Structures are given as C-alpha cells and as structure tokens.
UniProtKB/Swiss-Prot annotation:
It comes from Mycobacterium tuberculosis (strain CDC 1551 / Oshkosh). One of its GO terms (cellular component) is plasma membrane. Coiled coil: none annotated. It is found in: Cell membrane. This is Uncharacterized protein MT3732.
Length: 431
C-alpha cells in the first residue's frame, strides 16, 4: 500500500507533515530568504570578527598558522556539509514521491552520529602520517580539536538539512547564528586574555556544540530531529557518500584552500599570511551567504525539477552582479581596508584583490550549479564536477609562478571545469 510521501514518519510517533508549509512551501520565498539572509549576515559578521581578532592579535607568520587550521576545519566540515545536502534532498523530495508504508526507514541524525564517530577515528588514527606537514604549531591539540569538532559538526549539518527540508527556516537560521556567536565569543575572550594562537584554534571549533544547544532549547528543532526518511541506511549513505566526496572537494577550494596552498608551497611565511587573508576577505561576501543558503537552493531546485537550467539564470545573474561590484570595490579600497583594519604588515595590491574577487565569483557559480546537480540527484556529476575543479586548481598551483599569481590562476580557472560538468549533466536531465 502506497501512502503520500508528505507523511514523513517520526521516531516513536505517527506521521507528521513535512514542515508547517509543506514541501512546496517557498524555499526561496521572501520569508524564508529573509530569515536565512538575516542569519547569514550575522554569521558573516561573526566570521569576519574572528578573522579580524586573529589577524590583529597575531603577526602574519602566526596568522598563516591559524589560517591553515581554520582552513583545515573548514575543509573537513565542508565535506560534512554533504550530509546537509543529502538530508535536505531526501526530506524535501518526500513531497514528490510515493513510498511504501511497510518499507524501511532511516533516521538521518543517528546515521550522521555514526559518520561523525567514524570520522573522528579516521582523522585521529591517520594524523601521524600528515599532521606534521599541515600543522606547524600546536600539532596534537589541532588534531584533537579537528577530530572532535568534525564529529559534532556532522550532527550539526544533518540537523540543518532536516530543518531546511521541512521549511523550519527560523530554527535553521538560529542554528547558524548559535554556531557563529559561540565562535566569536571564544575568540573575543582569547583576544582579551591573551591566549594567542591556541585560543583562536579553540574558537574555530567551539560552535560545533550549537546543534546540542538547539535540541535542548527548541521544540520545533526536536520535532525535525525525530524525522525518518524512507529507504535503508545503506541507500542514504550511498547518496551521502557522493555528496560528501563532492562537498569535500568543494571545501578544498572554498574553506580548505590554505591547506592546499601549504601543501604546494615550501613555506608560506608572512607572504602566505597576507595571501590567505586576502583570499578569505574577497570571497566571504559571496561564498558565506551562498554556502549558508545551500538548503534554500537545493529545495528551490527540487521544486523547479522540470526546468533546472532556467532556474539557474536568476541566481547566477545576481552572483555576477554582486561579483562585478565586489571586483571594483576590492580594487579601489581593498588595499586601504587591509592596512587600516589589520595593520601595516598586511600589504596587498589592488590587482590581486580584484582578481581574487573574480575567482570568488567562479567558485560561487560552481557552488550554484552544484546545488542544482544535488537537487536533481546527479550525484556522480556533482562529485565529478567538484573533484575536477579541485584537481585542476591543485595542478595549477604547481606552476612555476609567484605565490600570488598561481593562487589567482588556480582559483579562477579550476572551477570552470566543474561548472562545465554540472551544466552538461543538468542539460541532459532537462531534455
């Protein structure tokens, strides 16, 4: 006997509708976008605050060490965002599918807990092989916090996906803000008491407990956390694995780029600290809100499943417009902002900042086409696009050019490979 898929089974409860608005209820409607947009703005400001405090408190040499850990945590949690993407797709798609009433069910939050525990073991167990190359200082503390922080973030990302899939955008935004505020509070305390590098490493991972705080304080969040989706755990994990691989590849370019830069350079030093800060500042205005709105975008593309290429046009135009303004602003006032905000040691050229902003537009476009591919369940194409972009960027970083030039070339040209892969796959589904 088939039942309407909008009836999602909760753990230990009867069927419950997918969100208060139903599956079709406005993933990019003004209300949901406003709530997530506000949360994104707060999150971005908090992220800037942490980076500002670290850059002001640490010299460029020290900031390059912090930047690598910040990037390493961004890399592994970016991969864990594959759980957010797959959970959003699974929950959201229920409004368009019929499922067997007698079929097996999967509890995404429990599965993500197992994934997080497994990730902790893998990172900690393998750390003797790679941590010495990546972490120049506070090596074992960095490994411990990276492992534990990732385990918590797996649950965080899955809970975000369940909230996005059920249109609980207020709670979605609150979870984002809780994560960001916890980070900036720890960073501010570090700045005041002079905890230096170790304190900023703690601040990077401190927000990984936000999911637990939300579960303890928010009944709607607890209701979403109890949801189960149709299908076996193995089926969910297969889809999540593709998303995690692709999200991991995307995280290398988006958050983990300092790690890639470190691995392809003999020594970063003060120049590396300046480049890492420049990359972070130029991409954040585009990529922070875009990454935060992954749930909205995937839900939107699921709703527009018959014309996904056309559905890309409006957000792509918005990204292009914002990017053009950003390039101009970065070239005109960027060097001055870096000197005034972070100190005279952080000297950067107008051309570098403008080109890095253009590179951020390329990665933003790749993020957008990737969200459309996830919504279409094109997991292989999604993975291939991001992996291709990452491999391309990594190879370009090996060119015998200056650090600034090869950084721009890698971040600008590598994403074009992935965009092409995604668009070809999406075009075939629309035929």
């Amino acid at each position: 006997m088939a039942v309407g898929a909008a009836a999602v089974t909760e753990v230990g409860d009867t069927a419950s509708p997918v969100g208060s608005s139903g599956a079709s209820g406005g993933a990019i409607a003004s209300g949901s976008v406003a709530r997530v947009g506000t949360a994104t703005a707060v999150t971005a400001l908090c992220g800037y605050a942490v980076i500002y405090l670290a850059a002001r408190n640490l010299a460029p040499n020290g900031f390059s060490v912090f930047g690598v850990f910040w990037g390493a945590f961004g890399l592994v949690t970016g991969a864990a965002n594959g759980l957010l993407q797959e959970t959003t797709r699974e929950v959201r798609s229920l409004g368009y599918l019929d499922v067997s009433a007698d079929g097996r069910r999967t509890h995404p939050l429990r599965v993500s807990g197992m994934v997080g525990l497994g990730s902790l073991v893998v990172i900690a167990g393998s750390s003797p092989l790679w941590s010495g190359r990546v972490f120049a200082e506070a090596r074992w503390l960095s490994v411990a916090l990276l492992s534990i922080g990732l385990a918590g973030f797996c649950l965080h990302a899955t809970l975000l996906g369940m909230l996005a899939g059920t249109n609980r955008w207020t709670q979605y935004g609150a979870l984002m803000v809780a994560d960001a505020v916890i980070r900036v509070v720890v960073a501010a305390a570090t700045f005041v008491i002079g905890w230096q590098l170790v304190g900023f490493i703690w601040a990077t991972v401190a927000g990984s407990v936000a999911w637990l705080i939300m579960l303890m304080t928010s009944p709607p969040t607890r209701a979403a956390a109890r949801l189960m989706t149709p299908g076996a755990t193995a089926t969910f994990l297969r889809g999540a694995a593709h998303s995690i691989i692709a999200a991991g590849a995307s995280a290398i370019l988006v958050m983990g780029f300092p790690v890639l830069l470190k691995l392809t350079s003999n020594e970063l030093g003060a120049q590396g600290g300046v480049v890492i800060l420049a990359v972070t500042l130029t991409r954040a205005p585009l990529l922070v809100p875009l990454t935060a709105m992954q749930g909205n975008l995937i839900a939107h593309f699921v709703d527009e499943r018959t014309e996904r290429i056309r559905a890309l046009i409006a957000p792509a135009a918005l990204i292009g417009g914002v990017g053009a303004v950003g390039m101009l602003a970065a070239g005109v006032v960027g060097p001055w902002i870096m000197r005034v905000a972070f100190g005279s040691e952080y000297q950067s050229s107008s051309a570098l900042l403008a080109w890095l902003t253009a590179a951020a537009v390329a990665i933003a476009m790749l993020t957008l086409t990737g969200a459309a591919a996830v919504a279409a369940a094109l997991h292989r194409a999604y993975s291939l696009g991001w992996v291709g972009a990452t491999v391309g960027s990594g190879l370009l970083l090996l060119l015998p050019l200056s650090l600034e030039t090869r950084t721009v070339v890698a971040l600008l040209c590598g994403p074009l490979v992935g965009i092409g892969v995604h668009l070809v796959a999406l075009a075939r589904t629309d035929e």
